[in-house]
């Protein structure tokens, strides 16, 4: 008595399904290989989230917080304070938890003597119109445009999912450079530095206090 074999087409389909399933399993394993590299909340760890974000992330300027908190000597990570802040934001961009994973232009939301944040539109040509609203990590609108962010916010940074911690700004209300509280241009810890509030949506959100530069705080970065 001979045994009947299943049609070749069926066997081929099964093999193909197993191969493609194994391929996607390897990809997902590599994407989230270790909790030391990617946290559970890191959207860059999820292939599904990456595809979803590219398709669905609305246009805008996205804010994210650094994963690390820093003392006020923020100039220690580059040749100048501006260069150092950019390096900090670029490094932390990799692990930023936000729905827009494809943005590539990164800047620190920190004022310096040469680059006050209110003037980023002129200095760095960031989009400053209602087609590029300022958004939180999940896409919620914080301000209708970059300029509109300084008088007040539509929602706090905590409500927008950006951060629940105070953060270095070295700024006055309105986004100007705080010439008094800036940790001596981010060079020492023996001074004071201006910080912002995650729970204030008034004009004071950029200046909620000026603690000693020995304290550690994250900084907020933008990406578009």
Model-derived features: positions:
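N-terminal secretory signal peptides that target proteins for export/translocation
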Residues: 1-14
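Generic extreme N-terminus detector
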Residues: 5-6, 18, 36
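Bacterial N-terminal signal peptides
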Residues: 17-29
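N-terminal Sec signal peptide cleavage junction
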Residues: 29-35
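Secreted/extracellular ectodomain signature
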Residues: 35-49, 55-224
């Amino acid at each position: 008595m001979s045994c009947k074999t299943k049609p070749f087409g069926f066997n081929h389909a099964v093999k193909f399904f197993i191969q493609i399933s194994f391929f996607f399993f390897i990809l997902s394993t590599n994407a989230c290989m270790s909790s030391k590299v990617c946290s559970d909340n890191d959207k860059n760890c999820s292939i599904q989230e990456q595809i979803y974000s590219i398709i669905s992330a609305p246009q805008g300027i996205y804010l994210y917080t650094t994963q690390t908190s820093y003392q006020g000597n923020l100039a220690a990570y580059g040749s100048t304070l501006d260069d150092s802040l950019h390096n900090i934001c670029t490094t932390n961009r990799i692990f930023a938890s936000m729905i827009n994973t494809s943005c590539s232009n990164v800047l620190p939301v920190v004022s310096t003597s040469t680059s006050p944040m209110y003037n980023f539109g002129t200095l760095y040509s960031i989009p400053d119109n209602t087609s590029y609203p300022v958004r939180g990590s999940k896409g919620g609108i914080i301000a209708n445009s970059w300029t509109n962010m300084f008088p007040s916010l539509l929602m706090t940074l905590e409500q927008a999912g950006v951060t629940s911690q105070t953060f270095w700004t070295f700024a006055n209300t309105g986004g100007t450079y705080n010439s008094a509280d800036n940790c001596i241009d981010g060079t020492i810890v023996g001074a004071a530095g201006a910080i912002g509030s995650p729970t204030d949506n008034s004009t004071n959100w950029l200046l909620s206090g000026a603690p000693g530069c020995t304290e550690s705080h994250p900084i907020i970065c933008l990406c578009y």
